[in-house]
Amino acid sequence: MKRASIIMIVGSLCLLGLFAFPLWNIMLGAPQYPDPLGMNIHITGIQGVSEFDLQNIDGLNHYIGMKTIPKADEMWEFNVFPIVIIAMVILGLLLGGLGFIGKIDHRYFLGWFVLMSVLGIMGMYDFNLWLTDYGSNLDPHAIIKVINEDGTPMTYKPPLFGYKKLLNFDVSSMPATGAWLMFIGMTLTLVAFFIGWKSKQSSSSDTNHKPATP
């Protein structure tokens, strides 16, 4: 159980990578831009991949009626997400420590994994809602209006995950380093659960096969 607890602690600490690396990355490439434009989405705000990327993206979006990229203080998520991550790290360290001294068993590690998974799904759902609003809630007085074949205004929602063609732009949306560290951390906590479970099974087997004392 001690080995499982150490892995649980290491897995929880991996989440701290979200404060150093971006969670998600969106890139826009087009023939007129030899160097693609991009934005890195951190849990504390949005930054351009290069110095003037956000400024250039906002300039392009202005013509088709899209909103400017929000500042950190304009979205509640950038205040709440860091608190949630810190809370989950502390909880993971606490569970790992209690497991190390034998106060709790491996099932608590699975509980942490399930809770983190639910929070992750909620975060992705919220991210998708923002992408939908960002790409669909357009200024009716935009300089350029593109109409679909059915007569409805074209929307410019970036993909939640993967690739999409928007006008003459190739748009990609992919997990960044912070997300991969989070996935690795969550996987480690799941590994900790299985190691703890196997350890308990082994201990139970040894107890059952222990010869009776005359």
Residue ranges and their predicted role:
Residues 172-199:
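A hydrophobic membrane-anchoring alpha-helix module
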Residues 119-131:
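Juxtamembrane membrane-interface segments at transmembrane alpha-helix termini
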